[in-house]
Amino acid sequence: MTDVAPSGALPQPSAEPPPLIGRVVATERLPSTPHAFHFWTRLDAPIGIGTIVRVASPIPVAGALPQVCGVVTEGQGYSDLQSPLHDVLAQDGNPDAARAATERTEIRLYTAQVLRQLPEEPLQPVPLGPVYLATEQDVAVALRMDGYLAPGRRTAIPVGVYRAGGLQVPVHLDADFLVGPEAAHLAISGVSGLATKTSAILFLLQSLFAHFPASRGRVAAVCFNVKGPDLCFLDQPGALEEGDRALYDQLGVPAAPFPAVHYFAPYTARGVTLNTLRTHPDLAHNVTPLTWGLPEVLQYAEVLLSKEDLDAKADALIDFIRERVVGRRFEDAGLSRPHEVQSFADLEAWFRDVLRTLEEGGREQWRTHHAATLRKVRNRLGNLSTRCAGLVTDDGALSDLPFGAFEDRAVYVVDVARVEEDAQDLVFARVVSRLREHLERRDLGVDHVVVFVDELNKYAPADGPDTYVRKMLLDIAERGRYLGLVLFGAQQFRSQVHRRVVGNAGTSVFGRMDGEELATPGYQGLSPAVKARLATLDKGQLLVRHPHFAQPVFVRFPRPAVMAGREGVERFPPPPEPTWQQAVARDLRRLDPSIELGWVTEVSALHDEAEALSARNAVLRQRPDDVRAAFLRALARRARPAAVDAEGVAPRP
């Protein structure tokens, strides 16, 4: 056995010899090969599926004694009986009868897949020899962790511990193969509720933040919360048992919640409160509205419009609007006035002016664009702010993630669990695209970003149409590691995710699996015994496949040191929806504690709800020193210009 070494350090051998547990056997029917071998053990040997063992050959090869490490993948037990009938006759057909005069010999025979051979050349069949239970140093060598645990390298990221025969050894992933540049991405699969997929990702992020070498740059995480309150309380401490705390200590990871977490969520359709379960007043300090206007949405119109909507003519008109109309002053001799299109309301006024020009002139085309195409695109684009109400604003207001100012070791949670599917797709597409753009320019604020997406089969399904989001995920999976854009994806059924997405994941993790899923072709490399263990894994247990591991290995990880979603909702219940006056006063009070409900009610008495909420949003984005004056100015700007008629078109002179 060896003394336990702290995570990130090479284990040191002790003088105590490892326990001898069996011997390699090879027959014509069960021969040893360079990649597999068989061995028998005592009946009481602490061996099971997933145990790592070492074979020591007494015969030198190329001047060195071969050492072979393997992991048990199958087990058998049998006796010298030729037929079950013989045992029945020996007991006179009665299981309770006196025992036979001679106790039958029973054997335990195991099959192991080779993890590593030393020396690695020449590669030969596993020799006959004694089999030992692996020590801590043996585990590090078998999984090739000695290379990235060595002094001067130290790119090891703890993922959990390997347990067998009373031994508990930290298992590490190589950061160069987890977040790049050698390989990247992680895919975790397992049945819902039992596989602890989200918990495993959260612990791995904590481990990554604690152990990622400073020499490799700055790292942050962007997590999309797509269901329930799973990720809503990452900055709150969770209850940990002593066993979990001991694992944190051994793995060198702080048993504490994430120190820097920033939340972003769109408003509800009404716009009074944020559409998230994290609305308790005690948690509002780090929650920022997520709202986009016309310029931000138009760039990703393909996400929200179907292929029937985006024919060649409509696509050409949208490109014209994006490049020539939005964000600049547009003048045309036939229009009633110059247009400065900054919002959906401005775009609607522009469309009405163009169509009125065609009707008054009796024409069917405007600048090569047919009137039918104009009406079609107008209807489709004008509907976006309604379909994504709360996220997409009519007034062009922008409140976004801090692209260009990301913090090292910070977590940015985008909560879209309560918004419609179209809005979820838009948020995912735009946020990830913006991350890529900034990483390409090297001005995001960090060098690596881990993007965590649950329900990956929804965004990159194995079957179905080739959507904008799926194409984007494929591109990230195949080229993201060169940019520092890393995908951590979770899904219940790995077989339902596009094979190029999971195939490009350098690390694959499996929690408790469904039997039908294990029967799919993607798991044919696993032995029946490993599949059987996968189908019965407890919470906190995982099977990890990594580029350095010749075979996947079972590990156990501690529960995350953050508050679970269900517990968080009980402790910080969302308050009832307030009136719009109460909502404005509450939000402005975050910037100026002296603001009272009576003052807000008084100054907004001549304004409707939409104008007051829009003014509030503007103040929250600006964060001015004089909140009262800024709110009054914003209210005044919300008044509709008198020179524009009800249809948004100025009267002709």
Where are these predicted regions, by residue range?
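Glycine-rich phosphate-binding loop of nucleotide-binding enzymes
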Residues: 163-262, 499, 544
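Conserved P-loop NTPase motor module
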Residues: 539-653
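Conserved P-loop NTPase catalytic core
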Residues: 245-276, 503-524, 535-538
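P-loop NTPase motor domains
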Residues: 212, 216-219, 223-224, 228-234, ...
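Short secondary-structure boundary/capping segments
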Residues: 88-89, 235-249, 278-281, 466-469, ...
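Phosphate-binding and hydrolysis-coupling loops of NTP-dependent motor/remodeling domains
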Residues: 2-15, 52-57, 107-123, 130, ...
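Conserved ASCE P-loop ATPase motor domains encompassing nucleic-acid-directed helicases/translocases
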Residues: 2-151
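Conserved ATP-driven motor cores of ASCE-family P-loop NTPases powering translocation/secretion/packaging/pilus
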Residues: 468-469, 474-561
